[in-house]
Amino acid sequence: MSKSQYFALAALTLCAIQAQASLVMLGAQDFQGTGLGAVNTILTLQSPGSTSNESGSVGRAVGNPNDVITGNAMTGASQTQTRTAAELGLTTAAQLRVVFNALEPGASNSILLNNLQLNIFSAAGALLFNSGAFTAINFSDTFTGAGNSGFVFGLDAAQAAAAQSLAFGAGFGTNRIGLSANLSNATGGFETFFVANAPAQVPEPGSLVLAGIALLGMAASLRRRH
């Protein structure tokens, strides 16, 4: 299946997924240069030995100045760590995006994401927000290679409003973002999750031309009036 075909299929499933979950898949997207060092990776998982299940989390705890890392999370440089909202460039809860990137072999590159939860902690380690229940998603094609393609998640409207109230108030830039995840049918390398602010949409060239024509028309109209 080609990437364009898979992205179209993924889009058709979004409505059903969004009706059942708090952290919902918004779509699949190609990424270039999104290896571990190129993005703000929060969580990296790898199934131990010959097993096919992996789970882990990274978060904070009151009274502990360091990250609390559990399960099969990898702890190498830039692999697993909480990051501040300011470091991630976050602006609002509604604009927060979690991107899942799987590294599975070409012959068996499907994977099941059983659970994915977003946690936001205060600078002191108190849990301010948890995204709650998640509906499992089976990815029949993950496109091999770290950084090739990612699956983008965001909060549903209710959870975005709750997160905004609880964790995006005054001074929210010092709050820290953590994640927890559970996957099965993991037969390859490592799976990574990074967090970013939703990028501003770049207008299509045709849209820019139309906008330019409209502006020229407005300018001509103003000149005629004067």
Predicted regions: what is each one?
Residues S22-Q201:
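Helix-boundary and membrane-interface capping/anchor signal
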Residues M1-L23, A186-A220:
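Short, threonine-centered small-residue motifs that mark membrane-proximal processing/anchoring sites
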Residues L222-H226:
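Short, charged juxtamembrane terminal tails flanking transmembrane helices
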